[in-house]
Structure formats: C-alpha cells, structure tokens
Amino acid sequence: MAKQVVLVCKRVWYYSSTDEDMFFEWISRIKCIATYDGVRDELYLYINTKRVSNENLRELLALFYRYKIDMKQLQIFLNKNNNQWFYDNKKAYWHRRVFGVNKV
C-alpha cells in the first residue's frame, strides 16, 4: 500500500473565477495527487508518495509558488534521487521557500 501525505493549502487566493478553474485543472493533472477535499479556507491534497516523480514534484513546486501556498511542506519529498536538483540547487526559485535560509 502506498504511503499518503496530506498537503494543506490555506487561504488560496484566486484572481478570477477562471484562475480558480485553472488551479483545479492543474491539480487534476498532477499524477501524484490522489484526491483532494476542503474545509472552510483549507484545501487538502492527498499525495500518493509512490507517484511523486521529479516531474510531479516540479509541478507541485510551480503550483505552490504560483498560488503562494506554504512550500515548506514540500521538504518531505526530498530524497537521494532528487537531492541534486531539489536541495543542492540553492539558486532555484523555490529553494528558500522550501528549505529556508542556511546560515554559515
């Protein structure tokens, strides 16, 4: 059985009704999102961790960045197979939002 992770999207801001439609279209195309539901101002994305490929993780990064969703929760997907591009790439647009600032 695949492990499931729940990502929380709090108070997602849509700029128009079409923007909201596109958000839900986008999440429907990310293969690792098994399902979603919501309560009040929170949307829960149920992630099948066995399906989190590099491509799917990049889509989650872009989605969370675009809609200003807390990206720190994406740290859970760091592993030896994606470490080089996901963590070691300190200049990537997502790095600070996912991993914070490293103080040397």
Predicted regions: what they are:
Residues 9-19:
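Short, surface-exposed ligand-recognition loops at beta-strand->loop->(often short) alpha-helix junctions
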Residues 40-41, 77:
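Residue-level "edge-of-site" marker
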Residues 49-104:
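Helix-rich interaction surfaces within compact, conserved domain-sized segments
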Residues 23-25:
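Histidine-anchored nucleotide/phosphate-binding helix
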Residues 1-2:
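Short N-terminal edge-element motif at the start of the domain
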Residues 17-21, 54-57:
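Conserved strand-to-helix beginnings and helix N-cap segments that scaffold or border functional pockets
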Residues 27-39:
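Short acidic amphipathic segments
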Residues 41-51:
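A generic structural motif
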